[in-house]
């Protein structure tokens, strides 16, 4: 037993030793990778990067940057690369002692140092590339500026007439570029690449601005010397022609406004000659705005004349229509009021319309007189005609509505008479049906309803014979009589149907009288009620007793009665 225990312990120890050696083998691979990485980063070409700068002009800012980067290389090597060897050595020693965690910590420190060293290299590479790129950009901008300088100088010399009085100042401004180009060469020669870049970039922007001035100045001069004076002339003679055609353009103030614009235009060329183009553009924009305002006023007058010519005849027709309709209404009202009641306000409205129409005709005559003058302001005429058109349209609408009302009075009277005749005819027809029915006698309420309808009809007929007639009151009374007649007819139909139904029920029940005493008794009661004109109650009793001996028969009898 002891032997087994000893063997087990030995096995465990052997396994533990094996695991330790396995772990140390793995850790040693990590150390070997760190050594390989150290060997790789030792070959990073710091010096080659700096060698690219040495090809440049190592003076001034370039020399300062070069020295700083060289110093950074030494510091990076001492601070980051040199301690790596020691860290790796310590890791190996600790690993031999099976201190895995401590060994790993040393390796981690070594990797962090190498990361920092690589970052230092990347930063140096970016700085070098940035300096080289800046040198390249500077040279490209410098070459472009030299080309622009020569081209601008040549353009002013070859096309001096296009720039007018601004040519001299342009030449002066262009000549200022030459010493600034030379200054760039000095900055570059001194190695001050940042200052050189700022200088040449600013110079390039100034050249671009002056180039844009050179492109804009001929257009401004053309507008100032040719286009606007031409528009002034066209506007002046155009207005003169329109005045000959009869337009009143005094409100446009052509002469005074043009003189003011010419004075304002005279200040533009001096601004151009001083290269104050923004102020020159503002003045030109103001002049063009005022010209547009004048053109708008003139165009409005021309359109107003066309509109006046189109609407004049329409307004004439509408005024004549209003006058004729007013005369017709006055005549018609005098005739109609003899036969029909008319509100006094309607008659007053017609007289008021007459006064308004006469007033509008007077205004229209004044407008025509104004249009016959040698100079007419058509915009005012247009406004006045619009006023006339609006008012005469309202008057015509109101007169037409009143005329329709007068026509409607006659139509309403005829309709009321027709309805009254239909009521009389229908009343007699219904009453004849009551008399000819199987009723023992005509119920008293129908006699009363008939007499009431007769009384109302006589009353309305008397009102029809009176003059003037109040049509609305008559129409309302006839409508009430029609309602009475409808009620009379509906109730009469109900009674007639109930009487037939009750009679059919009693006749059908006679077959059960001998066999069923209760049937005989109930039918006797139903007959009594029938004779007293109580048809609904007679139906209830007859239905009840028939259903007791023959279920469903009453529904069949009712359907036959309805079909008849």
UniProtKB/Swiss-Prot annotation:
It comes from Staphylococcus aureus (strain Mu3 / ATCC 700698). Belongs to the EzrA family. It comes from the Bacteria. It is a single-pass membrane protein. Residues 24-564 are cytoplasmic. The chain crosses the membrane at residues 5-23. GO terms for cellular component: plasma membrane; septin ring. Its main location: membrane. Keywords: Cell cycle, Cell division, Cell membrane, Coiled coil, Membrane, Septation, Transmembrane, Transmembrane helix. It is found in: Cell membrane. This is Septation ring formation regulator EzrA. Negative regulator of FtsZ ring formation; modulates the frequency and position of FtsZ ring formation. Inhibits FtsZ ring formation at polar sites. Interacts either with FtsZ or with one of its binding partners to promote depolymerization. Residues 99-138, 190-223, 271-300, 350-435, 471-550 form a coiled coil.
């Amino acid at each position: 037993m002891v032997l087994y225990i000893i063997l087990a312990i030995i096995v465990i120890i052997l396994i533990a030793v094996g695991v330790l050696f396995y772990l140390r083998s793995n850790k040693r691979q990590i150390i070997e990778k760190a050594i390989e990485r150290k060997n790789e980063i030792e070959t990073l070409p710091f010096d080659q990067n700096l060698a690219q700068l040495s090809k440049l002009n190592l003076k001034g800012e370039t020399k300062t940057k070069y020295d700083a980067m060289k110093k950074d290389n030494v510091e990076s090597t001492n601070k980051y690369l040199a301690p790596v060897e020691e860290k790796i050595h310590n890791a190996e020693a600790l690993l031999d002692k099976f201190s895995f965690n401590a060994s790993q910590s040393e390796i981690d420190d070594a990797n962090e140092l190498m990361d920092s060293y690589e970052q230092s290299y990347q930063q140096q590479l970016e700085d070098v590339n940035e300096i080289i790129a800046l040198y390249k950009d500077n040279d490209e901008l410098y070459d472009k500026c030299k080309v622009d300088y020569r081209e601008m100088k040549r353009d002013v010399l070859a096309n001096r007439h296009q720039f007018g009085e601004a040519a001299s100042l342009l030449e002066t401004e262009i000549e200022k570029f030459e010493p600034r180009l030379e200054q760039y060469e000095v900055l570059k020669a001194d190695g001050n690449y940042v200052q050189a870049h700022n200088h040449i970039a600013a110079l390039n922007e100034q050249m671009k601005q002056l180039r844009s001035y050179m492109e804009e100045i001929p257009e401004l001069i053309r507008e100032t010397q040719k286009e606007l004076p031409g528009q002034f002339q066209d506007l002046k003679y155009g207005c003169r022609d329109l005045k000959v055609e009869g337009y009143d353009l005094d409100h446009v103030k052509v002469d005074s406004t043009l003189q003011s614009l010419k004075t304002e235009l005279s200040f533009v060329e001096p601004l151009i000659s001083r290269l104050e183009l923004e102020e020159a553009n503002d003045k030109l924009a103001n002049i063009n705005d005022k010209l547009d305002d004048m053109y708008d006023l003139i165009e409005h007058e021309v359109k107003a004349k066309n509109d006046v010519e189109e609407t004049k005849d329409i307004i004439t027709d509408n005024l004549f229509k209003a006058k004729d309709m007013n005369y017709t209404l006055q005549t018609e009202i005098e005739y109609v009021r003899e036969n029909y009641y008319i509100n006094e306000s309607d008659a007053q409205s017609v007289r008021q319309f007459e006064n308004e129409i006469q007033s509008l005709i007077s205004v229209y005559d004044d407008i025509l007189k104004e249009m016959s003058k040698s100079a007419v302001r058509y915009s005012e005429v247009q406004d006045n005609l619009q006023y006339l058109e609006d008012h005469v349209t309202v008057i015509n609408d109101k007169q037409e509505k009143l005329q329709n009302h007068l026509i409607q009075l006659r139509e309403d009277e005829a309709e009321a008479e027709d309805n009254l005749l239909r009521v009389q005819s229908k009343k007699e027809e219904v009453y004849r049906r009551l008399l000819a029915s199987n009723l023992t006698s005509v119920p008293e309420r129908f006699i009363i309803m008939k007499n009431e309808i007769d009384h109302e009809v006589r009353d309305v007929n008397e009102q029809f014979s009176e003059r003037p007639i109040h049509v609305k009151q008559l129409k309302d009374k006839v409508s009430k009589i029609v309602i009475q007649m409808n009620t009379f007819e509906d109730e009469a139909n109900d009674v007639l149907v109930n009487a037939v139904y009750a009679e059919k029920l009693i006749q059908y029940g006679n077959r059960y009288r001998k066999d069923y005493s209760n049937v005989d008794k109930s039918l006797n009661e139903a007959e009594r009620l029938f004779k007293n004109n109580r048809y609904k109650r007679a139906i209830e009793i007859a239905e009840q007793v028939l259903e007791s001996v023959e279920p469903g028969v009453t529904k069949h009898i009712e359907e036959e009665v309805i079909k008849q």
